[in-house]
């Protein structure tokens, strides 16, 4: 992962910590943090943006909403992206996207939760409904061992199962239809491979319990449907997207790469069965 986005993360976590908040980080960076310290055959995808997920508790408290808006646009000096006003921010090459769990009690306009008028909105993410379950707490001192300022700073990342759910929905959104985007579909599929290939038995068992708890949820049923439709064989759309990715084991021949996909497919199907 590039040092620039890790530095961006440090500043965000430090600013949140000053007001007693701990951010939840999703997306490619969240995956990188979730798997930090694990032995991986492939490195997680590089990214220059941070996906910040706000919780119901943060969104429903007016003072907290205003505090987060001040941190982003004031303390950290992010500017608003023209193509994502008030929920996509930038500072130089750094990007910050604001997401939220589905929430009642604030103004919603389409996919947009209007948290602080003309200052902070958030992209409503229905598949994040269970995002606070089984969170992983990551110490920044593990990422910045030589930085004394990192001591005591922590960040939350979703569980591998919740990361998979987010990525399955994101892939499905970008693989076909009106929002089709080949580059983003490739990125989401690659992220799914990284999560599945790097997960351990504890992750799988935790996920199995999670899926039992929420098996009747429309979100879980949809996630299982995406796995069935787009990841249930090595020739399914999702795995073909991975195979097309230039960073997917470039030194292996096609048969060896397909074998990697077959193994990952079996893991993912078993995970959501």
Question: Could you describe each region identified by the protein language model?
Answer:
Residues 1-273:
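Compositionally biased terminal segments of proteins
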């Amino acid at each position: 992962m590039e040092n620039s986005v890790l530095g961006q993360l440090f500043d965000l976590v430090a600013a949140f910590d000053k007001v007693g908040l701990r951010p939840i980080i999703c997306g490619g960076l969240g995956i990188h943090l979730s798997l930090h310290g694990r032995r991986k055959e492939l490195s997680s995808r590089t990214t220059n943006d941070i996906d910040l997920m706000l919780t119901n508790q943060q969104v429903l408290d007016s003072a907290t909403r205003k505090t987060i808006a001040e941190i982003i646009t004031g303390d950290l000096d992010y500017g608003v992206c023209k193509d994502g006003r008030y929920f996509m921010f930038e500072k130089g090459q750094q990007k910050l996207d604001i997401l939220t769990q589905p929430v009642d009690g604030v103004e919603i306009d389409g996919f947009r939760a209007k948290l602080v008028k003309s200052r902070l909105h958030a992209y409503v993410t229905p598949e994040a409904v269970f995002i606070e379950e089984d969170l992983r707490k990551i110490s920044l001192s593990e990422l910045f061992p030589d930085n004394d300022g990192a001591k005591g700073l922590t960040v939350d990342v979703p569980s591998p199962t919740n990361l998979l759910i987010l990525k399955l929905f994101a892939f499905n959104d970008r693989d076909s239809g009106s929002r089709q985007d080949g580059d983003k579909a490739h990125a989401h599929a690659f992220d799914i491979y990284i999560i599945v290939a790097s997960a351990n038995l504890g992750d799988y068992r935790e996920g199995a319990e999670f899926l039992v708890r929420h098996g009747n949820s429309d979100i879980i049923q949809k996630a299982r449907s995406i796995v069935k439709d787009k990841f249930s064989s090595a020739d399914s759309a999702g795995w073909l997207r991975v195979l097309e990715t230039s960073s997917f084991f470039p030194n292996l021949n096609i048969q060896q790469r397909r074998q990697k996909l077959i193994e990952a497919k079996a893991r993912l199907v078993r995970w959501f069965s």
